[in-house]
């Protein structure tokens, strides 16, 4: 259900007195000046917005290939909070971020001690989008959070125009390469569903995606034999 509201965030200016009768939701004072960011994807968005200096700490440093973030962690200007599945709570308490940005895990049952720190937890559910442009539009939410609204709107407008132009280029292509993707992990081979962002991306790029007719919006676990 793409119309269902999963969570509400109430953004109030840092210098603004809290108004009476705020809607129910997680209160976030903006602009966020010091965030703990779990995902390399969201670090990339903040890099595009020129807001790396707003990242006070990260998780899973080994997956973040952004030189400025690597350098800031090495010099101690940015906190490495360790593994996103089991972050270093003491480090997080010490630098006390304005907000914690993470990707929600399905049926996770919550985030343990993180939820008890009194710090706004922002669940970035962009991975649940079913189109590449839908996912990229999350940059506008980040713009609101970090005081970069104008830059975010401009960036999304440019990305959208470029993407649609590229989609038009492949509409008349008759020869479409067949595509499968991902790798076997454990006993299953997880492939993007036909209605997933990645599945749509392959199709928009002019590929004949093997699971294009599949109705799933997430990953599908298949056996090695099924894939081959």
Residue spans for each PLM region:
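Alpha-helical, coiled-coil/dimerization segments enriched in small aliphatic residues
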Residues: 190-220
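Ligand-binding pocket segment of bilobal, Venus flytrap-like solute-binding proteins
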Residues: 220-228
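Short, glycine/acidic-rich beta->alpha junctions
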Residues: 27, 84, 106, 183, ...
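Hydrophobic/aromatic ligand-binding patch that stacks against planar heteroaromatic rings
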Residues: 45, 91, 113, 201, ...
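Extracytoplasmic substrate-binding proteins
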Residues: 28, 77, 94, 98-189, ...
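A short, structured surface patch at a secondary-structure boundary
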Residues: 3-93, 99-106
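Short, solvent-exposed loop/turn and secondary-structure capping segments
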Residues: 46-50, 111-113, 192-195
């Amino acid at each position: 259900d793409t119309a269902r509201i999963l969570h509400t965030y109430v953004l109030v200016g840092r210098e603004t007195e809290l108004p009476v009768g705020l809607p129910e939701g997680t209160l976030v004072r903006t602009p966020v000046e010091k965030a703990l960011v779990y995902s390399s994807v969201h670090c990339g968005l903040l890099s595009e917005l020129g807001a790396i200096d707003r990242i006070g700490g990260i998780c899973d440093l080994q997956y973040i290939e952004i030189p400025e973030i690597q350098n800031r962690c090495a010099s101690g200007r940015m906190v490495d909070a360790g593994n996103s599945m089991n972050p270093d709570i003491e480090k997080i308490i010490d630098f006390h971020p304005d907000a914690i940005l993470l990707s929600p895990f399905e049926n996770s049952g919550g985030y343990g001690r993180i939820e008890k720190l009194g710090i706004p937890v922002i669940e970035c559910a962009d991975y649940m989008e079913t189109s590449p442009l839908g996912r990229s539009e999350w940059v506008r939410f980040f713009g609101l959070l970090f005081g970069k609204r104008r830059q975010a709107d401009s960036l999304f407008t440019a990305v959208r125009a470029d993407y649609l132009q590229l989609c038009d280029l492949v509409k008349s292509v008759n020869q479409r390469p067949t595509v499968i993707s991902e790798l076997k992990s454990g006993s299953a081979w997880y492939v993007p569903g036909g209605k997933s962002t990645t599945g749509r991306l392959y199709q928009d790029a002019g590929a004949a995606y093997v699971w294009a007719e599949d109705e799933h919006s997430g990953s599908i676990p298949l056996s090695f034999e099924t894939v081959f």
